[in-house]
């Protein structure tokens, strides 16, 4: 018992010896709380400023390329409205101050330039009251607006709003675009990903894309994964590999050796990765067309791959799942020349395909590292 007591004392003494040894200034809890609030407000404002930039590019990409999304389209007007209640709980205490929101009515925090909402005269700061006589709810506002537009389609929307205390009536004429959500995720890594249900653009991408044309290439690339059916094709390739591996596993099992599905699992992964680099090249190619069709001048936008090489130096030489950054830079230069030639000759701006486009897949696999 005495030995154990000395062991505890020795352990405490050793921990104390390893503790910080400087005499730090004392911080007031109130000062920390005040600084925390300042940073929370700044972060939320920055997020929605970045989201506005992404939404502007995404709106144009979706609207200009609706034909490639086949039946997966919906009506859109190009605005975002929020209330403190419609945001996650952790933002409620400061979102009204950060974004100048109202609790009693949804406040418009973003209007895409050139969108139906902008054309109708809706402005940032307007307070929405009703769409075609239906009150706009103060909870789940973005989802409600999206659902209303899916049901309403391209029919005009009479919007009643309040601006500076004065009620106004405006008519918005929606446009139809690709329905896939394009969301902003806070993540410093410059990356983007897509699955058949959504596209995710990480905040690091907005940091490294110096122009909206560069950002449009990234969004177009991710949309290309979906419209070209890459996820579906990878799943089929994986199933083929898995089937072959199952045959090998079964052969070993007949000989009394249990492999634990080793060959099935390995060949499934190999099958899914078989054309990964080719799919990425195709998404770059198709995405360049999508960006151009949306009105972006992509000449020089291939520089995004030189910037990416600074962030991910391994991409300069390694091409395990994606082309190298030099290949992607040079490919986009050639695609830009191809598009420019078509524009000069008055030809349709559609990618040159070997076969008809595939429908969006139903698997949930993601294409990462754009």
Identify the residue ranges that each predicted region occupies.
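PDZ/PDZ-like peptide-tail recognition elements
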Residues: 46-106, 171-173, 177-188
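Active-site-proximal gating segments in proteases and membrane effectors
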Residues: 71-85, 187-190, 242-245, 268, ...
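Conserved PDZ fold ligand-binding element
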Residues: 117-141
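PDZ-domain C-terminal substructure recognizer with occasional recognition of PDZ-binding tails
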Residues: 144-183, 258
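Catalytic Zn2+-binding segment of zinc metalloproteases
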Residues: 205, 210-214, 223-239, 296
């Amino acid at each position: 018992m005495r030995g154990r007591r000395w062991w505890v004392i020795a352990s405490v003494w050793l921990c104390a010896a390893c503790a910080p040894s400087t005499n730090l200034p004392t911080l007031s809890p109130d000062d920390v709380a005040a600084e925390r609030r300042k940073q929370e407000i700044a972060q939320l404002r920055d997020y929605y400023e970045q989201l506005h930039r992404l939404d502007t590019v995404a709106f144009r990409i979706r609207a200009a390329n609706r034909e490639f999304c086949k039946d997966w389209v919906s009506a859109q007007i190009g605005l975002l409205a929020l209330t403190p209640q419609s945001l996650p709980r952790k933002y409620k205490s400061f979102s009204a101050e950060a974004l100048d929101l109202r609790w009693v009515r949804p406040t418009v925090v973003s209007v895409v330039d050139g969108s139906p909402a902008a054309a109708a005269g809706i402005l940032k700061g307007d307070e929405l009251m009703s769409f075609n006589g239906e009150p706009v709810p103060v909870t789940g506002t973005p989802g409600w607006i999206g659902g209303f537009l899916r049901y309403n389609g391209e029919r005009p929307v009479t919007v009643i709003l309040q601006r500076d205390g004065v009620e106004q009536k405006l008519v918005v004429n929606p446009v139809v675009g690709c329905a896939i959500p394009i969301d902003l995720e806070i993540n410093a890594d410059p990356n983007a990903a897509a699955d058949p249900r959504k596209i995710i653009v990480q905040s690091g991408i907005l940091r490294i894309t110096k122009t909206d044309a560069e950002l449009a290439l990234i969004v177009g690339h991710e949309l290309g994964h979906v419209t070209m059916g890459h996820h579906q094709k990878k799943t089929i390739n994986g199933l083929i590999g898995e089937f072959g591996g199952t045959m090998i596993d079964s052969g070993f099992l007949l000989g009394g050796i249990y492999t634990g599905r080793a060959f099935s699992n390995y060949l499934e992964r190999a099958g899914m990765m078989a054309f990964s680099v080719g799919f990425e090249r195709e998404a770059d190619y198709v995405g360049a067309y999508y960006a151009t069709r949306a009105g972006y001048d992509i000449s020089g936008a291939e520089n995004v791959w030189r910037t990416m090489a600074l962030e991910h130096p391994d991409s300069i030489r390694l091409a395990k799942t994606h082309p190298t950054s030099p290949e992607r830079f040079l490919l986009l230069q050639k695609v830009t020349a191809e598009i420019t030639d078509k524009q000069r000759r008055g030809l349709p701006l559609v990618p040159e395909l070997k076969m008809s486009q595939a429908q969006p897949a139903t698997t949930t696999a993601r294409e990462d590292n754009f």
